[in-house]
């Protein structure tokens, strides 16, 4: 299986298995990053997708947790993946991997290989 197909499968699997629920509703706090069990918000989806891809042997330097802002101004977190078909975003709002340039987000920062970095001109 090529890397794009694996990313597509994991994205679909996680999006279907987790029901969106804010950290405030679930934990009583605005932010709580963890692996989801049935419920989670955007960073929980991204963390689970990252975990499942790593378990399949995906290189850590080809994955990044991205913090961004949606057009509404609300903070959001997605997973960046580098595949055999290029770079894509795995997002709980999309059923399929999306090119960063096709998303309406303002990119803030990315955690890749253990280092947070500012994103300038990412898309």
Residue ranges and their predicted role:
Residues 1-123:
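A structural boundary/capping signal
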């Amino acid at each position: 299986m090529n890397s794009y197909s694996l990313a597509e499968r994991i994205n679909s699997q996680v999006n279907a298995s987790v029901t969106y629920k804010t950290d405030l509703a679930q934990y009583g706090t605005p932010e709580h990053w963890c692996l989801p069990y049935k419920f989670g918000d955007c960073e929980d989806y991204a963390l689970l997708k990252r975990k499942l891809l790593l378990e399949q042997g995906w290189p850590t330097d080809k994955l990044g947790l991205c913090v961004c802002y949606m057009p509404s101004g609300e903070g959001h977190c997605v997973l960046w993946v580098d595949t055999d078909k290029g770079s894509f975003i795995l997002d709980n709002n999309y059923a399929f991997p999306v090119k960063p340039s096709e998303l309406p987000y303002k990119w803030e920062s990315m955690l890749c290989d253990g280092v947070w970095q500012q994103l300038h001109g990412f898309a």
